[in-house]
UniProtKB/Swiss-Prot annotation:
UniProt topology in membrane: Multi-pass membrane protein
Predominant localisation class: membrane
Bias (Polar residues): 8-26, 45-55
Gene this chain is encoded by: GAP5
Entry GO MF terms: amino acid transmembrane transporter activity
Name this protein carries in UniProt: Amino-acid permease GAP5
Family stated for the protein in its record: Belongs to the amino acid-polyamine-organocation (APC) superfamily. YAT (TC 2.A.3.10) family.
UniProt induction comment: Expression is under control of the CSY1 amino-acid sensor.
Region spans: Disordered: 1-55
Organism superkingdom: Eukaryota
InterPro entries: AA-permease/SLC12A_dom, Amino_acid_permease_CS, Amino_acid_permease_fungi, APC_YAT
GO biological process, one term: amino acid transmembrane transport
Compartments where located: Cell membrane
Keyword entries, A-Z: Amino-acid transport, Cell membrane, Glycoprotein, Membrane, Transmembrane, Transmembrane helix, Transport
Length: 618
């Protein structure tokens, strides 16, 4: 890659390597002249001094002026050129379709308004939801305390490796759509198309599902009011959060995530007291439930089933990667946020689950007696401890969690739809971003799908959502698998093209080995899911059970081969030497970047050991 100016210092000046034959001016002089004559107009400034706030509000919904369209409008009428990653223009003959897509994704009109604290809290608490607070109950019942602990520890290590790989890619290429764009870049466009659309389907279904879950959670206190009344309240709340821009989303997530973290830490402290015999009923639990009824339930099949629940509970961990295009300083904030994943897995998942196995036996009938908050092992532990009132507190935490996940589902769906539109994999209208940086059309599409939540009072919601979830039920696993593959392919491309990790602002702490481990475990989870789809736990084999479990894989295959037929491209992988590792980078002057990184390493090397340890882990 040739030396270029950094993105922040680059102006839209057509590149020419020729000296003017008539004037003898150098190309740089010509560039300055053309820049002064053809400077594209900037975004309209706020007219609060001369206009009303209402007119400013209305204007904010108008389309943002796109950098690429401006460049095309103000460049030479006879020049057939494109802007490259560093802000230069080259002949279109020199750019592949993937390079054009990569550049387009890096020039998103989304606003960089997410601060470091927003990313920190999103990373820590983004996946603390019904999977951990309720889903662990069913996993404990089917796998036993030993099975659930093994599943969450191994899955946690896999997620840690995956997030490290994602951080390396997202910091290097902070593009709209995050990791979804990188699948087409490093693996194959058909893989990117199929996995990204499955990801969209997952979160399209998740929004109404979480709204229904919120209305059902309210029924813990009151069953007289029609659930659709609560659906309306939560629907308006969640949709409003995203319509007011990414900054409000970040603030709301920061508050809700803080409450979730405080609640889980409080439960951990309470559980230690209960396990030690400090409950009002005076019962000392210790590890007796590991001996009676035992450490494992339903043998190897039971343990395998807990891996699926563990994968579901970790869904949403990758959301940090989607924020790269809207982070104020992705180079600094994203690595720090992704490092927090280790502590979240250790504290909020592993420690919580260990304490749950001390307090609730796997044969407790309430674990499988319902699918709502009453099946939460957290609530059961509090109730069995003889503590009144705290069950309502935990129910409130579950309510906060489902609202948070619902809001995040709108964010994830809308940003992924924008990236698909930028890649020409979705209708162009889906990529509409207004002057406030809001992807309005994508948000509207997501909110329209959220109207499915009004079936909450129909009595058929369980059957409807079971089939809707089956369409994209494996989406998170496919996404994590492709993140790891993309990381390995990126490192391979660096090696083949004579480059190394010295030019990366963040390098995965688990490296390529961690990505291989992530691939291995995700493949094993898919195999376990297939086995349980054919031979379900506790019932006979049947087609309905199989498709409820594995329909997502069938949908993925249809999307994949459909895209292959559409593009008539039957190449399985982009060759390593052909992978584009330059377009869309935030830092494009590699020599200056290497010097800066070396200086940072020297400064860190001179710090005390405790500081270096803190920097590594936090």
């Amino acid at each position: 890659m040739s030396k270029k100016y950094s993105e922040e210092n680059t102006s839209s000046i057509p590149l020419t390597d020729l000296t003017s034959p008539s004037t003898g001016e150098t190309s740089s002089q010509q560039q300055r002249q053309r820049a002064s004559q053809q400077q594209p107009p900037q975004q309209p400034e706020s007219n609060t001094a001369t206009g009303s706030r209402w007119s400013n509000f209305v204007d904010s919904f108008k389309p943002a002026i796109e950098n690429e369209k401006l460049a095309m409008r103000y460049r030479d009428a006879n020049a057939d050129v494109e802007e490259d990653a560093g802000g230069y223009y080259n002949s279109t003959d020199q750019l592949t379709e993937i390079q054009r897509i990569n550049i387009n994704s890096s020039k998103s009109n989304l606003k960089r308004k997410l601060k470091n604290r927003h990313l920190q809290m999103i990373a820590i608490a983004s996946s603390i939801g019904s999977g951990l607070l309720i889903g662990t109950g069913g996993a404990l019942a089917t796998g036993g305390p030993g099975g659930i602990l093994i599943a969450w520890i191994l899955s946690g290590i896999s997620i840690l490796c995956t997030i490290q790989a994602m951080a390396e890619l997202a910091v290097t290429f902070p593009v709209s759509g995050g990791f979804n764009v990188l699948f087409s870049r490093f693996i194959d466009p058909s893989v990117g198309f199929s996995v990204a659309w499955n990801y969209v389907l997952q979160y399209l279904v998740l929004l109404p599902l979480e709204l229904v879950a919120a209305s059902m959670t309210i029924q813990y206190w009151n069953t007289d009011i029609n659930p659709d009344v609560w659906v309306i309240i939560f629907y308006v709340t969640v949709t409003s959060i995203n319509f007011f821009g990414v900054r409000l989303y970040g603030e709301v997530e920061f508050i809700l995530s803080s409450l979730k973290v405080i609640a889980v830490v409080g439960f951990i402290i309470l559980s230690i007291v209960l396990a030690a015999g400090g409950a009002p009923n005076g019962v000392h639990h210790g590890t007796k439930y590991w001996h009676d009824p035992g450490a494992f339930a339903n043998g190897f099949k039971g343990v395998s089933s807990t891996f699926i629940t563990a994968a579901f509970s970790f869904a949403g961990t990758e959301l940090t990667g989607l924020t790269s295009a809207e982070a104020e300083n992705p180079r600094k904030a994203l690595p720090k946020a992704c490092k927090q994943v280790f502590w979240r897995i250790l504290l909020f998942y592993v420690v919580s689950i260990i304490l749950i196995t001390f307090l609730v036996p796997y044969d407790n009938p309430r674990l499988l007696g319902a699918s709502d908050v009453s099946a939460s092992p957290f609530v059961i532990a509090i109730q069995d401890g003889g503590i009144s009132g705290l069950a309502s507190v935990m129910n409130s935490v579950i309510l906060i969690s489902v609202i948070s996940v619902g809001s995040s589902s709108v964010y994830a769906t809308s940003r992924t739809l924008v990236s698909l539109a930028e890649q020409n994999l979705a209708p162009k209208i889906c990529g509409y971003v207004d002057r406030a940086g809001r992807p309005l059309v994508a948000i509207l599409i997501t909110n329209v799908f959220g109207l499915l939540s009004f079936i909450a009072a129909s009595g058929k919601e369980d059957e409807v959502f079971t089939w809707l979830l089956s369409i994209s039920g494996l989406s998170s696993i496919f996404t994590w698998l492709c993140i790891c593959i993309s990381h390995i392919r990126f490192r391979r491309a660096l090696h083949v093209q004579g480059r190394n990790t010295d030019e990366l602002t963040f390098v995965s702490q688990t490296g390529v080995i961690g990505s291989w481990f992530g691939i291995l475990l995700n493949v094993l989870v898919l195999v376990a899911e297939f086995w349980l789809a054919i031979f379900p736990l506790g019932e006979k084999s049947n087609a309905k059970s199989f498709f409820e479990t594995y329909l997502g894989f069938v949908i993925l295959i249809i999307f994949y081969f459909g895209h292959k037929l559409w593009r008539n491209n039957w190449i399985l992988f982009i060759r390593s030497r052909d992978i584009d590792i330059d377009s869309g980078r935030r830092e494009t002057d590699l020599e200056a970047l290497k010097r800066e990184l070396q200086e940072e390493r020297e400064v860190l090397r001179n710090k005390p050991f405790w500081y270096r340890a803190y920097h590594f882990w936090c």
